[in-house]
């Protein structure tokens, strides 16, 4: 089941397992990002995957930016993240993300994220500190945005 998630006690442990960020950094992000929604995929009432949707614009068009998409290690390879991504693509006209590595480029491409944009075409109405969060964590030599439009 997919539902909106606001409980820091559920968000923080998954975020920490996936990205190794401190609780302080996660709380700073959660408390200071103003245009945000978290969606979680629940398996038997337990959170298994989550992602954040953050308002942004690409070349003046409104998008939902998918950020911090993650799944518990013991719940991977079951399609939970794919279900969340499908939900986003079905419920929002335009969604985008920045793949963190080459493996994820292929993963997202297979899930129909096929429109490519340069990072400087993306704009957020967020503080500079939050913008730093939104662009970090990518190991690609030349990071880029992948998008899906209905």
Language-model regions, residue ranges each:
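Conserved GNAT acetyl-CoA-binding A-motif
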Residues: 90-102
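Acidic/histidine-enriched, beta-strand-rich ligand/metal-binding domains
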Residues: 67-68, 76, 105, 110
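Conserved beta-strand in the GNAT
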Residues: 40, 45-57, 62-70
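Short amphipathic alpha-helix that is part of the acyltransferase structural core
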Residues: 1-28, 35-42, 46-47, 132-150
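Short glycine/proline-centered loop/turn elements that form peptide/ligand docking sites
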Residues: 81, 103-104, 121-126
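Conserved catalytic-core motifs of GNAT/GCN5-like acyltransferases
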Residues: 109, 114-136
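Conserved acetyl-CoA-binding loop-helix of GNAT-fold acetyltransferases
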Residues: 71, 77-90
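Short alpha-helical
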Residues: 10, 102-103
């Amino acid at each position: 089941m997919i539902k909106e998630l606001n409980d820091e006690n559920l968000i923080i442990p998954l975020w920490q397992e996936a990205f190794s960020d401190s609780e302080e950094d996660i709380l700073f992000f959660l408390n200071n990002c103003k245009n945000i929604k978290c969606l979680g995929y629940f398996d038997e009432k337990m959170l298994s995957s989550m992602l954040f949707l953050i308002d942004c614009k690409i070349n003046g068009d409104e998008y939902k930016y998918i950020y911090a998409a993650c799944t518990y290690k013991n719940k991977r390879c079951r399609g939970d993240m794919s279900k969340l991504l499908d939900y986003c693509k079905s419920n929002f006209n335009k969604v985008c993300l920045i793949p963190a590595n080459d493996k994820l480029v292929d993963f997202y491409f297979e899930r129909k994220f096929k429109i490519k944009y340069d990072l400087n075409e993306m704009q957020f109405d967020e503080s500079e500190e939050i913008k730093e969060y939104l662009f970090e964590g990518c190991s690609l030599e030349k990071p880029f945005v992948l998008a899906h439009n209905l």
